[in-house]
Swiss-Prot record:
Pathway: Carbohydrate degradation; pentose phosphate pathway; D-ribulose 5-phosphate from D-glucose 6-phosphate (oxidative stage): step 2/3
Catalytic activity: 6-phospho-D-glucono-1,5-lactone + H2O = 6-phospho-D-gluconate + H(+)
Function description: Hydrolysis of 6-phosphogluconolactone to 6-phosphogluconate.
Recorded GO MF terms: 6-phosphogluconolactonase activity
Protein name: 6-phosphogluconolactonase
GO biological process, one term: carbohydrate metabolic process
Superkingdom of the organism of origin: Bacteria
Tagged with keyword Hydrolase: yes
Gene3D superfamilies: 3.40.50.1360
Entry's EC annotation: 3.1.1.31
Keyword field: Hydrolase
Originating organism: Helicobacter pylori (strain J99 / ATCC 700824) (Campylobacter pylori J99)
Family designation: Belongs to the glucosamine/galactosamine-6-phosphate isomerase family. 6-phosphogluconolactonase subfamily.
NCBIfam families associated with the record: pgl
Length: 227
């Protein structure tokens, strides 16, 4: 358990390695489970990776795609993670995959209803691909929300970050640790510094990503690009 760190000089080489591991995991999980469930993170950073994954020659029709986290906004909004996946991943060969959103088509003002919907439709992913912010957040588990410190029984939790826009739904620490594998993709000197800080932390953790990297239940493969 814990983590494995793979370092690369540039993002292109980093993505190549991650994609190779993705293919290996995908095919092994398909053989084991007869279906593969993968959760993806949002944000702008993974766009080029999503595009590269979309053209892979895999049995996408046997794949269920879901979200690690989502902002509580309409699916048509530019900041929607569901829109991000539809625009950049669920294209080309990956168009054959099934997609399960975290939010219903019509969003009510009752966040408890939205949370219930997300948990009722949740399917445990075999793999989750994560990113990390310069504040050490991952998924939508932010340092100031303390949700990452809780052993939530729910698979999806509501978070209300004070340093980022929108209320959000996010996979809980429990759900992330129940994955068979986690991939973390980061780049740049600043995020390397955050990673180093997280690796040195001891419980109770101040950084959400540290909680993941020191997990005794799941291994995180960290793909780091210097540039």
């Amino acid at each position: 358990m814990g983590y494995q760190l793979f370092e690369f000089e540039n993002l292109e080489d980093c993505h190549k390695a991650l994609i190779e591991r993705f293919k290996e995991f995908f095919n092994a999980a398909l053989k084991k489970h007869h279906q593969v469930s993968v959760a993806f993170s949002g944000g702008r950073s993974p766009i080029s990776l999503l595009q590269k994954l979309s053209v892979l020659d895999l049995k996408w029709h046997e794949c269920l795609i879901s979200l690690v986290d989502e902002r509580i906004i309409e699916a048509s909004h530019e900041d929607s993670n569901a829109k991000l996946l539809h625009d950049y991943l669920l294209q080309n060969n990956a168009l054959k995959a099934s997609f399960t959103p975290l939010l219903p088509e019509k969003i009510s003002g009752d966040t408890n209803e939205l949370l219930d919907f997300a948990n009722q439709h949740f399917k445990q992913p075999h793999l989750a691909i994560l990113g990390m912010g310069t504040d050490g957040h991952t998924a939508s588990l932010f340092p100031e929300t303390s949700a990452f410190l809780n052993e939530e029984k729910e698979n999806i939790v509501l978070t209300k970050p004070t340093n980022a826009p929108y209320e959000r739904l996010s996979m809980s620490i429990n759900a992330l640790e129940n994955c068979e594998k986690l991939f973390l993709s980061i780049s740049g000197v600043e995020k390397r510094g955050v990673l180093e800080k997280a690796l040195k932390e001891n419980a109770p953790y101040s950084l959400p990503i540290a909680r993941i990297l020191h997990s005794k239940k799941v291994t995180t493969e960290v793909f780091y690009a210097k540039n």
